[in-house]
């Protein structure tokens, strides 16, 4: 029996889960979601969680391992892991956390690395399959996810199990594919010294595309979205501008042409980058489209054009025909990954 404490720690919320592993099955013993802004540091969250566990379970079982996926860079210095959650001011130290939890080792991993491990624990109902393909055992697995930014990672077989390797693929150059995307690139170059694909294929990118189309003065802007975008432009990054644009684009009654064209450009740019990652990895173990945006715009990604653009790679398009491609629907994939990794320590 293995008892694991796992966490998915983001800028606004933290989800902690205590789970028991028997053979390959996990049983959730207790879990709780915390609003990060309500706590001065992570230790306060941890103490409250442990106290709640004791109330719920009668006592806290002896932990076998703990792993926390954190929305920030992880630093490894002489086997000591540290991390910083910038917008909350929280700091993490693996040695200190191990002392607090009375265990030998605590693992800190980047939140997108946690997503990488998480795809190994997903069930069929957690996925929407774009292309069934043919799985080749122990082949590379690719993971890409648009949220606030754009995460990319891959899984490689180490002879015993899969290991996740983080990349900074979201910061590679944006490559426009047509005249309108060239205009978009020129527009963004007025703001930035260089334009990464993350500037387009992300939640921030959705707003940037909207601003580009709005400033061309070719499509009328709706007052509701205009208000949210103006708040975003004034520094309120939690104005939900991107979500409002996506929702309007999918509305059967709204018919917001500006939102619809924004999401068309976003979806096509995202598809092109998914295809780029597929070419670089040849992930015959599967390619997983994760991140917070995909499940929310699933109808747009179910359109056959999304898959067509993924595979539209000219002379080498045929290389992608047999790669299994899935959209991750389970929002707890990062927590699942932290749980799986924690159990392997």
Please place each PLM-identified region on the residue numbering.
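A general structural motif
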Residues: 1, 60-65, 103, 138, ...
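ATP-binding/phosphotransfer module of carbohydrate and carboxylate kinases, centering on a glycine-rich
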Residues: 1-56, 183-345
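Short glycine-aspartate micro-motif
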Residues: 4-8, 63-67, 107, 141-145, ...
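Short, acidic Gly/Pro/Ser/Thr-rich loop/turn segments
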Residues: 14, 73-75, 149-153, 208, ...
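Active-site nucleophile and cofactor-binding loops and adjacent substrate-binding regions
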Residues: 34-35, 84-89, 107-114, 133-136, ...
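Short beta-strand-loop/turn "lid" adjacent to the catalytic site in phosphate-handling enzymes
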Residues: 55-108, 113-126, 143, 296-299
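Short, electropositive alpha-helical surface patch
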Residues: 120-132, 343-345
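Glycine-rich phosphate-binding loop of actin/hexokinase-like ATP-binding domains
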Residues: 129-132, 136-199, 203, 298-299, ...
